[in-house]
């Protein structure tokens, strides 16, 4: 039976849904973020008369969108709310977190609270999803999926050497797996190869429908140009969006994870690209030392890729 596991890392919590040794889905959360289902209080600071939407302010000064307000809600009142969507950074804009009055919202289940905590996720499990999101590409027999996070939608292009119908059908399973691996939501556009005949397009629609039967969403049928649009609940930034808008932060957290997973005595030598230095917060470095019981030395190498940080043990 599939089971959610959670690893509480340094600067990041990571959850994966495992079925045996297969990863079915993955999620991550950065401490301090508002998340769907979270209960909060906010002061209503702006609301137009007769409207049901407004702006709230948290105790720490952050702003949040509030929907489904009672029409008689007054500015200045403190309201109990349930978060429906975390904040999402996009190229060129920032989507504020969103919430509803607690009595008007259906709380989302919190995987991070219900998952079974483990000290370490199985080797390679998180790395597979992270590497795929980092590269924005997933290869499969006969083709590849190319992912692009844009303000309008997440765009997925399918390319390959197979005939159009065979290529589209071969892409369905890796595509539907990626949706869960990256924790994608919102508007998703899939550019399949153009399939001229209706029976061919129908076969792809049916295959896609079967593969996504247990994943809540709405979608269009494939049009004559091979385009399919999916709309799913958006609860926060996907792993793909984090790579697009907070790549340094994501890479810094992965660098710390690699250092933490090394076993043995000595001193931890963590080698990173210079751009990551400022992202390794002092409290994170201290936590790494506490968890490993080893001193930490950080050195930079401009020849390294941002994502290619590596750790090793050296003699003290």
Label the predicted regions.
Residues 88-93, 131-141, 214-218:
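Active-site phosphate-binding and catalytic loops of NTP-dependent enzymes
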Residues 141-315:
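Conserved glycine-centered short motifs in functionally critical loops
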Residues 17-35, 39, 120-134, 163-166, ...:
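A short, contiguous, amphipathic alpha-helix enriched in charged residues
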């Amino acid at each position: 039976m599939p089971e959610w596991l959670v690893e509480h890392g340094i600067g990041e919590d990571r959850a994966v849904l495992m079925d045996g040794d297969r990863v079915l889905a993955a999620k991550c959360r950065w401490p301090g973020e508002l998340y769907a289902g979270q209960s909060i209080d906010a002061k209503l600071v702006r609301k137009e008369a007769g409207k049901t939407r407004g702006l709230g302010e948290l105790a720490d000064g952050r702003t949040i969108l509030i929907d489904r307000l009672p029409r008689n809600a007054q500015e200045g009142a403190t309201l109990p709310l349930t978060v429906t969507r975390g904040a999402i950074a996009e190229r060129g804009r920032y989507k504020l977190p969103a919430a509803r009055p607690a009595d008007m919202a259906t709380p989302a289940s919190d995987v991070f609270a219900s998952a079974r905590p483990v000290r370490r996720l199985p080797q390679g499990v998180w790395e597979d999803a992270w590497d795929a999101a980092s590269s924005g590409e997933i290869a499969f027999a006969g083709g590849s999926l190319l992912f692009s996070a844009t303000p309008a939608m997440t765009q997925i292009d399918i390319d390959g050497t197979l005939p159009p119908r065979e290529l589209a059908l071969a892409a369905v399973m890796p595509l539907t797996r990626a949706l869960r691996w990256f924790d994608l939501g919102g508007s998703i556009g899939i550019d399949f190869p153009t399939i001229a005949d209706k029976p061919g397009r129908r076969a792809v629609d049916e295959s896609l429908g079967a593969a996504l039967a247990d994943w809540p969403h709405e979608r269009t049928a494939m049009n004559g140009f091979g385009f399919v649009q999916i709309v799913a609940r958006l609860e926060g930034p996907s792993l793909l969006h984090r790579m697009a808008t907070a790549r340094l932060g994501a890479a810094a957290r992965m660098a710390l994870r690699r250092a933490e997973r090394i076993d043995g005595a000595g001193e931890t030598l963590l080698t990173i690209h210079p751009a990551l230095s400022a992202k390794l917060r002092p409290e994170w470095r201290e936590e790494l030392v506490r968890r490993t019981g080893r001193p930490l030395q950080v050195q930079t190498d401009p020849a390294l890729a941002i994502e290619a940080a590596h750790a090793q043990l050296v003699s003290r």
